[in-house]
């Protein structure tokens, strides 16, 4: 497997030094950068060892995925722009999590929300296809939103979209907070397109930590048994990037039997 870390481009040298294979950038931030900055990033990614596997945090809160403010026209306009930037940077995937974009008011029609989410994913699938980019739906947890909170719901959603380049992010952090079973991953394992890991420690979303090694071992063995051999990205929002990134890749190498001497 290959390893990535979700962070800003300023930390590219750090990830290179630590031995990460990929950097994963916040799409909603990258999409607004000036052309000169994007060109500079493109040059670094083309010549450097560490590549950009894709975007997390892809959709800003003002772009609704579901709900009263959802707009097909707005979704397509944003998808065109984001996918073009992704194509320039050579990414392979865009994760659609973005909890602020999928909060429903009390009593909202859930079947309608499902229809909106399907349309949103279809739009992104269509706009990303010319660039060879895959779209990954990410299920969340109740502390972040109120729509799309389980792996099984996400799988059913993606199956309805029925596009080869629309798949799932398998996020252990959300599964743990939701207390979901790894057995749920047996439902359409071919839809696992990308993996995120992080650890809830108190109120902080940290990188992966040695104290939880047994659970990580179980998770990675499950992924292997289902035929997944892709990228695992650490998506931590707390702690210092240098410490979280260093500790996480050290543990990932051990878990995957790739520990350097």
Which stretches of residues belong to each language-model region?
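N-terminal substrate-binding region of glycoside hydrolase catalytic domains
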Residues: 14-35, 56-64
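Glycine-rich, proline-tolerant flexible connector loops at the mouths of alpha/beta enzymes
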Residues: 25-46, 98-105
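Active-site acidic/histidine proton-transfer and metal-coordination neighborhood
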Residues: 66-167
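Short hydrophobic interaction/assembly module
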Residues: 45-72
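Catalytic-core regions built around general acid/base machinery
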Residues: 37-49, 119-128, 184, 218-222
């Amino acid at each position: 497997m290959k390893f990535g870390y979700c962070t800003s481009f300023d930390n590219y040298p750090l990830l290179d030094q630590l031995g990460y294979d990929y950097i994963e950038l916040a799409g909603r931030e990258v999409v607004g950068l000036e052309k000169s900055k994007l060109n500079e990033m493109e040059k670094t990614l083309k010549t450097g060892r560490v590549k950009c596997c894709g975007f997390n945090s892809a959709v800003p809160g003002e772009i609704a995925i579901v709900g009263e403010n959802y707009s097909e026209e707005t979704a397509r306009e944003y998808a065109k722009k984001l996918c073009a930037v992704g194509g320039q940077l050579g990414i392979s995937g865009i994760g659609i999590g973005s909890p602020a974009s999928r909060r429903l008011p009390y009593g909202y029609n859930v079947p309608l929300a499902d229809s909106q989410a399907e349309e949103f994913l279809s739009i992104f699938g269509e706009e990303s296809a010319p660039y060879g980019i895959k779209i990954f739906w990410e299920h969340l947890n109740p502390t972040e939103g109120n729509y799309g909170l389980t792996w099984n719901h996400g799988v059913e959603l993606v199956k309805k979209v029925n596009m080869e380049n629309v798949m799932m992010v398998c996020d252990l952090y959300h599964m743990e907070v939701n207390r979901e079973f790894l057995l749920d991953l047996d439902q359409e394992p071919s839809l696992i397109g990308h993996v995120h890991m992080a650890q809830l420690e108190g109120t902080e979303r940290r990188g992966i930590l040695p104290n939880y090694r047994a659970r990580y071992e179980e998770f990675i063995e499950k992924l292997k048994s289902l035929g997944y051999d892709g990228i695992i990205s650490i998506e931590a929002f707390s702690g210092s990037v240098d410490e979280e990134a260093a500790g996480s890749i050290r543990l990932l190498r051990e878990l995957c039997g790739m520990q350097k001497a």
